[in-house]
Amino acid sequence: AGLRFTDCRVPDRYRLGEVGEGLHVAMYSLGLSRLHIADSNLGMAQRMLEMSIARAKERITFGKPLVKRQAIQTMIAESGKWIYLLRSAIHDAARRYEAGEDPMTQASLCKLASIDTVKIVSDNMLEILGGIGYFEECEYGPAERLYRDCRAMWLEEGPPSVQRTTAARGLITTGGD
């Protein structure tokens, strides 16, 4: 299925780029949109980590706060690691974009990393929050909504399989940079 315009005239003031460059303009915009999704996922992951830490500080089990337990500390550190790496990747991709580089490869890599990040952080959050994390609204924030929303982000601007293909093509073309 395709879309074809025959004898369609578009005034110059409405044209987004040069004639014949429409696909390039669309693909460039798609890269920026993927970077935006990665940044949105970063924000969700950061919020989930904050909720996890707040709960772990307050919840007492067997005489001490969850935050004092090594297993919980491991989940918090793992979540923090993924968030830090994603934030660094997004900053690098944004720097490249501002330098005039094509953001498609890095944007796809950032979106892939953001999917992994929110998956890990949301699983850790639900484990730390326990049963209250499944309620629509718990006292620490919208855990259930964040969990659901981060899963929906997988599909926006292409699922992970599309991101892998796009990233691989770009990496192969540039030799890995």
Question: Can you annotate each of these PLM segments?
Answer:
Residues G2-R4, E21, Y28-D177:
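Alpha-helical interface subdomain recognition
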Residues T6-V25:
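Long, acidic (Asp/Glu-rich), low-complexity accessory segments flanking structured domains
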